[in-house]
Amino acid sequence: MIDENHPMRAAGNFFGRRHGKPLRPHQSNLFEDLLPRLKLDLATPAPQDLRSLFEAPVETVRMEIGFGGGEHLHHESGRYPQSGFIGVEPFINGMAKMLAALDQAPRPNLRLYDEDATAVLDWLPDASLAGIDLFYPDPWHKRRHWKRRFVSDANLDRFARVLKPGAKFRFASDIEHYVNWTLQHCRRHAAFDWQAESPADWNDAYEGWPGTRYEAKAFREGRRAAYLTFIRR
């Protein structure tokens, strides 16, 4: 039965390949031992107070979708120990890098999920997140694949449901078409405001931004990034 309060998940995947290079033995062990301790259990109802998901006492909860190798998420969760973080990454090698970082420097304010982010969004209570980050998502360059882009009307509806009023949706990309696509979708959505006042508001990286390996590669190849911030009304 379909829950009429939640949008249906799209039939197609929003992500590409699940696996790249073979995992080393230690990485495989982390998937067996560490990930089960950190992974959200969507088979049980989400707590109305998401702060109870974390070992550490936290004040607010944020979510990063598609964290890649985890550079930003690991950095932010260490920088803001008073905030809880939910990180979602279906790409196995990216999750392996994140688990290795957590093995060396644990984060009691961090939980993970290694499958479809829309399942997490549909599981979360209304107005439960202080922010959502979506950095360098797969742009799905071919026109016939644009429907797989994570920024869509259906997913913005999901964001609007789980974000608190005044919460931020942050989006970064080095693909101009995807940047424009996101601007168009968010600016026509009734729940979001884009409050940029000058080019610096999208040309300059976010305060405290650590950069990522993907971003560094894009810069080496001559591409520039845009950093967009939308506010939940």
Curated annotation (Swiss-Prot):
A GO molecular function assigned to this protein is: tRNA (guanine(46)-N7)-methyltransferase activity
Q: Which Pfam families does the record associate with it? A: Methyltransf_4
| E.C. number | 2.1.1.33
Annotated active site residues, numbered on this chain, are: D138
Q: Which organism is it from?
A: Brucella melitensis biotype 1 (strain ATCC 23456 / CCUG 17765 / NCTC 10094 / 16M)
Q: Where does S-adenosyl-L-methionine bind?
A: E64, E89, D116, D138
* Assigned keywords, A-Z: Methyltransferase, S-adenosyl-L-methionine, Transferase, tRNA processing
Record flagged with keyword tRNA processing = yes
**Source organism superkingdom:** Bacteria
Q: What class of enzyme is it?
A: transferase
Reactions performed catalytically: guanosine(46) in tRNA + S-adenosyl-L-methionine = N(7)-methylguanosine(46) in tRNA + S-adenosyl-L-homocysteine
Keyword check for Cytoplasm:
no
- Protein name (record): tRNA (guanine-N(7)-)-methyltransferase
Checking SUPFAM superfamilies in the record gives:
S-adenosyl-L-methionine-dependent methyltransferases (SSF53335)
GO cellular-component terms in the record? tRNA methyltransferase complex
